């Protein structure tokens, strides 16, 4: 029996062994034939495979259609379960999703393998069968089929611009989900533009009671768990933990511990303890899918990074399957940990949406499904659990111990009793209706719901009107003042918006400004009427409701209330009340891009208020409502030369012949102006007003500069400085029409006013954020390479108005990689598109490779160098690059105070043919430390560029000599302040170099610096400032203005620095302007001061950022030498005329030729120019030259011919016209070629024909009779000059008649030297005579007034009395022979010694 029993036992063991897949001596072979010929399945192959599996396993497999991608590809999920037709009660649904980023493909193929493996092996492997039978599994191999189609196999990193990572719109889907930290209005706005792939997944996730999920990515090897972001929005390295952190860590470890590589945590140059990480600790992102699952559903989701390479070769897929198979299966089993159960009512019916709470984890209750099911994942432990539901009593807490030892979760059911209800009292539904239907009222009151009075409102009436309407609609309006007028009146603005009070991300800001000219009142009254119209129609007019809900509107009704108060009703074209109380036209008072004059030199309070208001809000579109004409006017309002030509500012009834000045957005501006004009019943006709019959405006629109020049205008300032597109709308020919006419104006302008507001939505808009979802403020958004930029706001939202069609969009954020993409604005209503932009963090080394010849020192570990370190670095650069660099240190008085580095090609060769540039770290000692770090970076850039033979650098050094001055004098004082407080920002010294240069006191540094400028005669100078990002330069010269624009035009325009004002910053700004003007006026040196930072001495880590933001502007400055004109000036014998000079016509600056070969060279922007070449005693020459960009035009040798003066020679100018008179024009100069102003030029014998020279020595005399005439020039302190001319042609002016006056060296007919000599002798003789006479008079008076004046013998005294040696007392020792009659009390004595006798006299005075 024992033997038989042993036999049966052995047989039983053998039988059992047959059912175990991995027992010793027996293994069930798995079906993994799908690993043969590994490849990535295409979309078509994937769909066919899923269809085949569904057909092969009709009960266990089912394909679900989730939605379509942006390009129409199917999003599919394969369900694998015991019975796909009907899920068994309490079977937990689990999902695996992959290929969210289209170029991260390993997970996509692993889920394909997973489907084949589960279905092919669940019947032969019992554990696998148990898993499939007890779990409802959903596999989504690709969430982003469009991105996958764009990706390329073998690329371990994303393609340029992250093509393939995002969907077809290049949107990162893992930033597109609703976020738990979003405000409700942001959530609603983002929902409007959610990508179809995201929307499909969101709907699917919330529609099923998923318990567990995994999202498979690539690019690292780690298991990441929520949360992915935090309230602090740190970039990284700070954990953001869920209430279920212990569960998530267990889930992550389940995957990692079963992965042979992941569990080590050190793959891909990363370091993750145990192969897991909290998402926010790794890097933060908002809008991620795993956070959405946990926050908005019951699902616990992990993000699994599978491989270092995002899209590895297909041959690696079998190896990846073997690494991840166990982890995939074990994670599925985690759906069965914790507790599960049903929540039902007393009758056993399921309660949907009941909440199941675990004590200590109340922040995350589990909601029941429609069938009353719940699952609560928990780690082992003792828990107290209860359930609650609306309308039911909360259950009693139940204590439960979780061990997770079983194959299924511990079951815990709840039955809830209904809440007892006892409603006392009578209730009735109150329905509130208007007394009259809105449609009837609108028809009765012409679109309004209440009667409307068309009348004028003075300031008091307007203020009362606005207060009343604001109090009537408090939920839609906000009344606020932006400042006060000169006379103290408030500048009232009414905000109209669904939720007024603050900027709402994603909602555009719009403004209307009226009554800028106090006597132009139509805009003001129409805005008051428009306000009433919109508020009354809100809620019963779909158009108005949509406008108010989606647009934040601001109406400034009167910008000039003081002017309005003195205006006169009925004024059609007058000027009373046009200006403010200071008599200033406010539309001439804004800062102008081309210059400053008396109209905008001092900012008026109304203008300052409007500027501050405009800059405080992200206005997208604006209109300035005027009167006096009927036209829509768009920028620019003036040209670059209009500050020098007052005649261009006159409205002379004709726009023919005026030069337009379009912006880069000219087509867009014309479209906006056309929208307003075409909506007006007559504006589009372009007919003139009665008083200006020659003003015709095609299509009712005009460019401002082409109409008439307005310098200091508001619409140009809005475009250039505030980034807001603004039009000026002239609303009618009459400025202050009668009140009875206002109803007609309202009928004409109502539709244009509304249509113009609606244009704020046209174009491109969205949000700019980082890869972790952090909003990026100040990001630059540009279209089609234009220089005009839009900037994202605090929440990352941006608006870029654009016409329908394809555009190239460029986005740049500080410390983020640039992003370029092509977008298409639809050509159907509403002509807008949402484009959210994700920027990747920038790599400094990558930037250095692309922009700075890979000079890592310029961007990594930046610091402030001490004076010895700076000198050592400059000396080292000279030693290593002697052919292009020369270090000046203690080689002269200048080099002792200012160490400098001189750079040019072939040091030591003649430099007459080269431009001279000066780059100074700063003229402020407190800014110099930052400036000289930028200067050192620039030197390294040029040196490295020359080593690499970069074309631009080599050409620069061939054409120029550049002096670099890193100021060192007070560095240690400033550096000590910084070391004591690294956040000092703006150190302050009492005596800056710039102030010393402007001051009258003698200073060694100042003197040697100014002497250096005089001796070297630089062409241009660049220096660095702080406190702003502006570029300061001499105003008024169009060439210098073009240079400034060229410097500021960079590929990527960073957001202008918004630096808070301070007293020292304002002082530096004013000092810089004075210094710039002084340098230009006295030393003929244009100085450009580039603002590079808010702080004068920011933290040294920020030096790299300052360098990166400004390198392009600095390079643009140096590139100015590439364009210009040059030549040699010689006489007719080929000899150089070293006293010659060159003047650019219509410009003040004069360029002297070089002292050796008489060469001149001018840096000029491209364009057509006129040059006047002049030399003493030689006829001037006028030369027309067309300067091409990037090329120095060589004029060769310019031959000058001597003057023919009036010494019996007559200069004939052949003409053929028979007119009786002509005109003569020219210039009067002194011998040094300086203009002589106020010189009298006249025709001898014709007393009425005379004129005086202007500031540049120019003159013109008209109506000069034909024939032989004599011109005479007279000027104070100069000898007069005459010239005889023979004029025989009338009508055509005789130009370029140049006089050179000699200084009158005679005074009173004597040569100046002889006069000075004679005058000096006469003065000396006169002085001597006066002294002698005074002395004689003094002695006479002294003698006459002293009666005791007398002579006496010297008293004879011994040594006792005189206190002298024995010899002094005489040999005989006598004491006194005679007593002197002089009074003894007189003590002062004067000895008079007669040289011809031996007598001594004593004159004693009282």
From Swiss-Prot:
GO terms for molecular function: carboxypeptidase activity; metallocarboxypeptidase activity; structural constituent of cuticle; zinc ion binding. Disulfide bonds join 156-309, 236-237, 268-308. Optimum pH is between 7-8 for the active carboxypeptidase-like domain 1, and 5-6.5 for domain 2. It catalyses: Releases C-terminal Arg and Lys from polypeptides. SUPFAM superfamilies: Carboxypeptidase regulatory domain-like, Zn-dependent exopeptidases. It is found in: Membrane; Cytoplasm, Perinuclear region; Golgi apparatus, trans-Golgi network. The gene is svr. Belongs to the peptidase M14 family. A motif (Cell attachment site) lies at residues 1343-1345. It comes from Drosophila melanogaster. GO terms for cellular component: endomembrane system; extracellular region; extracellular space; Golgi apparatus; membrane; perinuclear region of cytoplasm. There are 3 carboxypeptidase-like domains. Only the first two domains seem to have catalytic activity. However, in svr proteins there are two alternative carboxypeptidase-like 1 domains (CP-1), a catalytically inactive 1A form (in isoforms 3, 4 and 6) and an active 1B form (in isoforms 1, 5, and 7). All 3 carboxypeptidase-like domains (active CP-1, CP-2 and CP-3) appear to necessary for maintaining full viability. The C-terminus in isoforms 4, 5 and 6 may be required for the retrograde transport of these proteins from the cell membrane to the trans-Golgi network. Disruption phenotype: Larvae lethal. Larvae die around the first molt at the first or second instar stage. Keywords: Carboxypeptidase, Cuticle, Cytoplasm, Disulfide bond, Glycoprotein, Golgi apparatus, Hydrolase, Membrane, Metal-binding, Metalloprotease, Phosphoprotein, Protease, Repeat, Secreted, Signal, Transmembrane, Transmembrane helix, Zinc. Glycans are attached at residues 133, 269, 458, 549, 612, 652, 787, 808, 981, 1152, 1251. PROSITE patterns: CARBOXYPEPT_ZN_1 (PS00132), CARBOXYPEPT_ZN_2 (PS00133), PEPTIDASE_M14 (PS52035). Its cofactor is Zn(2+). It comes from the Eukaryota. This is Carboxypeptidase D. Zn(2+) 2 binds at residues 517, 520, 626. The modification Phosphoserine is found at residue 1380.
């Amino acid at each position: 029996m024992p033997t038989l029993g042993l036999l049966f036992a052995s047989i039983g063991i053998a039988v059992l062994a047959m059912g175990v897949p991995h027992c010793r001596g027996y293994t069930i072979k798995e079906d993994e034939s799908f690993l043969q010929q590994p490849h990535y399945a295409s979309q078509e192959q994937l769909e066919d495979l899923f269809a085949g599996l569904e057909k092969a396993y009709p009960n266990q497999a089912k394909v679900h259609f989730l939605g379509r991608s942006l390009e129409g590809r199917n999003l599919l999920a394969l369900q694998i379960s015991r019975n796909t037709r009907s899920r068994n009660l309490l079977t937990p649904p689990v999902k695996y999703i992959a290929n969210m980023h289209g170029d991260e493909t390993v997970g996509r193929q692993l889920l394909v393998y997973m489907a084949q493996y589960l279905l092919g092996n669940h019947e032969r492997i019992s554990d696998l069968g148990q898993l499939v039978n007890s779990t409802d599994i959903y596999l989504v191999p690709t969430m982003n089929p469009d991105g996958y189609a764009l990706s390329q196999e073998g690329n371990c990193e994303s393609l340029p611009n992250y093509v393939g990572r995002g969907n077809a719109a290049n949107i990162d889907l893992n930033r597109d989900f609703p976020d738990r930290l979003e405000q409700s209005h942001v959530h609603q706005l983002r929902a409007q533009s959610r990508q179809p792939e995201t929307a499909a997944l969101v709907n699917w996730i919330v529609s099923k009671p998923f318990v567990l999920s995994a999202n498979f990515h690539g690019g690292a090897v780690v298991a990441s768990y929520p949360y992915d972001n935090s309230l602090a929005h740190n970039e990284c390295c700070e954990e953001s933990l869920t209430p279920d952190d212990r569960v998530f860590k267990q889930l992550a470890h389940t995957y990692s511990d079963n992965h042979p590589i992941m569990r080590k945590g050190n793959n891909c140059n990363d370091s993750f303890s145990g192969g897991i990480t909290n998402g926010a600790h790794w890097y933060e992102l908002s809008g991620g899918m795993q956070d959405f699952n946990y926050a908005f559903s019951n699902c616990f989701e992990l993000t699994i990074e599978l491989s270092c390479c995002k899209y590895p070769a297909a041959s690696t897929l079998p190896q990846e399957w073997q690494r991840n198979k166990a982890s995939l299966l074990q994670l599925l089993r985690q759906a069965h940990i914790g507790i599960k159960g049903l929540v039902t009512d007393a009758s056993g019916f399921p309660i949907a949406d009941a909440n199941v709470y675990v004590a200590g984890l109340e922040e995350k209750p589990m909601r029941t499904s429609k069938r009353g099911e719940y699952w609560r994942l928990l780690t082992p432990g003792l828990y107290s659990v209860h359930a609650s539901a609306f309308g039911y009593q909360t259950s009693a807490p139940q204590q439960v111990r979780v061990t997770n030892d079983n194959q299924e979760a511990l079951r815990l059911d709840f039955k809830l009793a209904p809440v007892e209800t006892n409603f006392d009292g009578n209730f009735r539904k109150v329905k509130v209706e208007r007394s009259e239907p809105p449609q009837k009222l609108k028809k009765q009151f012409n679109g309004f719901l209440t009667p409307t009075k068309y009348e004028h409102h003075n300031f008091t009436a307007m203020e009362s009107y606005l207060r009343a309407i604001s109090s009537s609609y408090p939920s839609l309006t906000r009344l606020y003042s932006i400042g006060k007028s000169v006379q103290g009146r408030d500048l009232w603005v009414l905000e109209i918006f669904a939720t007024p009070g603050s900027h709402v991300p994603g909602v555009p800001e719009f403004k209307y400004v009226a009554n800028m000219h106090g006597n132009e009142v139509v805009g003001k009254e129409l805005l008051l009427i428009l306000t009433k119209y919109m508020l009354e129609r809100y809620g019963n007019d779909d158009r108005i409701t949509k406008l108010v809900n989606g647009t934040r509107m601001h109406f400034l009704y009167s910008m000039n209330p003081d002017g309005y108060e003195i205006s006169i009703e009925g004024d059609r074209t007058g000027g009373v009340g046009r200006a403010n109380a200071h008599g200033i036209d406010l539309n001439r008072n804004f800062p102008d891009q081309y210059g400053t004059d008396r109209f905008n030199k001092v900012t008026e309070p109304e203008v300052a208020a409007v500027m501050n208001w405009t800059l405080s809000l992200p206005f997208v579109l604006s209109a300035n409502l005027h009167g006096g004409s009927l036209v829509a006017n768009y920028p620019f309002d003036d040209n670059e030369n209009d500050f020098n030509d007052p005649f261009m500012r006159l409205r002379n009834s004709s726009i023919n012949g005026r030069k337009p000045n379009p912006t880069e957005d000219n087509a867009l501006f014309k479209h906006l102006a056309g929208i307003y004009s075409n909506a007006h019943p007559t504006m589009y006709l372009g007919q003139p007003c009665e008083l200006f019959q020659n003003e015709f405006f095609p299509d009712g629109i005009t460019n401002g500069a082409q109409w008439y020049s307005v310098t200091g205008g508001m619409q140009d300032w809005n475009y250039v400085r505030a980034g807001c597109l603004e039009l000026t709308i002239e609303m009618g020919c009459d400025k202050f029409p009668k009140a009875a006419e206002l109803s007609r104006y309202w009928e004409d302008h109502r539709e244009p006013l509304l249509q113009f507001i609606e244009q704020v939505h046209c174009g491109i808009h969205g949000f700019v954020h980082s890869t972790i979802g952090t909003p990026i403020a100040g990001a630059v958004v540009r279209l089609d390479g234009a220089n005009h930029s839009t900037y994202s706001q605090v929440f990352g939202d941006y608006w870029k108005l654009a016409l329908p069609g394809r555009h190239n969009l460029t986005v740049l954020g500080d410390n983020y990689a640039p992003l370029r993409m092509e977008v298409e604005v639809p050509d159907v209503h509403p002509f807008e598109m949402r484009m959210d932009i994700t920027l990747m963090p920038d790599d400094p080394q990558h930037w250095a490779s692309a922009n700075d010849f890979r000079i890592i020192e310029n961007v990594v570990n930046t610091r402030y160098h001490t004076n010895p370190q700076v000198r050592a670095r400059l000396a080292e650069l000279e030693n290593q690059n002697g052919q292009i660099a020369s270090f000046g240190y203690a080689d002269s008085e200048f080099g002792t105070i200012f160490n400098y580095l001189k750079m040019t090609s072939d040091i030591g060769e003649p430099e007459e043919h080269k431009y001279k540039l000066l780059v100074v770290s700063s003229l402020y000692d407190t800014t110099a430390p930052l400036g000289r770090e930028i200067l050192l970076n620039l030197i390294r850039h040029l040196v490295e560029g020359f080593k690499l033979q970069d074309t631009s650098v080599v050409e620069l050094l061939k054409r120029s000599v550049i002096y670099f001055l890193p100021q060192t004098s007070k560095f240690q004082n400033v550096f000590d302040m910084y070391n004591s407080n690294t956040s000092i920002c703006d150190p302050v010294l009492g005596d800056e170099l710039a102030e010393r240069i402007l001051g009258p006191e003698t200073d060694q540094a100042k003197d040697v610096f100014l002497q250096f400028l005089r001796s070297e005669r630089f062409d241009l100078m660049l220096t660095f400032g702080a406190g702003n990002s502006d570029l300061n330069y001499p105003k008024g010269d169009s060439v210098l203005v073009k240079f400034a624009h060229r410097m500021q035009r960079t590929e990527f325009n960073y957001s202008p620095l918004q630096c808070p004002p301070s007293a020292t910053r304002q002082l530096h700004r004013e000092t810089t302007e004075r210094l710039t003007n002084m340098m230009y006026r006295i030393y003929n040196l244009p100085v450009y001061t580039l603002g590079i930072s808010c702080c004068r001495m920011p933290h040294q880590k920020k030096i790299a950022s300052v360098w990166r933001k400004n390198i392009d502007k600095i390079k643009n400055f140096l590139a100015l030498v590439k364009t210009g004109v040059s030549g040699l000036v010689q006489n007719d014998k080929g000899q150089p005329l070293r006293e010659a000079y060159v003047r650019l016509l219509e410009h003040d600056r004069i360029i002297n030729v070089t002292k050796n070969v008489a060469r001149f060279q001018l840096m000029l922007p491209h364009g057509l120019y006129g040059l006047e070449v002049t030399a003493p005693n030689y006829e001037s020459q006028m030369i027309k030259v067309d300067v091409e960009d990037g090329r120095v035009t060589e004029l060769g040798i310019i031959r000058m011919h001597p003057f023919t003066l009036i010494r019996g020679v007559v200069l004939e100018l052949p003409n053929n016209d028979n007119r009786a008179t002509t005109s003569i024009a020219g210039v009067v100069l002194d011998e040094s070629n300086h203009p002589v102003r106020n010189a009298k030029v006249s025709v001898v014998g014709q007393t009425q024909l005379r004129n005086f020279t202007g500031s540049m020595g120019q003159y013109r005399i008209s109506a000069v009779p034909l024939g032989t005439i004599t011109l005479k020039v007279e000027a104070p302190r100069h000898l007069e000059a005459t010239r005889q001319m023979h004029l025989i042609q009338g009508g055509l002016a005789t130009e370029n008649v140049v006089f050179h006056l000699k200084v009158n060296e005679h005074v009173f007919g004597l040569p100046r030297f002889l006069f000075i000599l004679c005058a000096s002798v006469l003065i000396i003789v006169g002085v001597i005579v006066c002294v002698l006479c005074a002395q004689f008079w003094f002695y006479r008076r002294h003698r006459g007034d002293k009666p005791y004046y007398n002579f006496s013998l010297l008293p004879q005294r011994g040594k006792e009395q005189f206190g002298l040696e024995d010899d002094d007392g005489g040999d005989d020792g006598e004491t006194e022979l005679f007593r002197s009659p002089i009074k003894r009390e007189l003590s002062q004595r004067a000895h008079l010694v007669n040289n011809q006798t031996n007598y001594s006299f004593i004159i004693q005075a009282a």
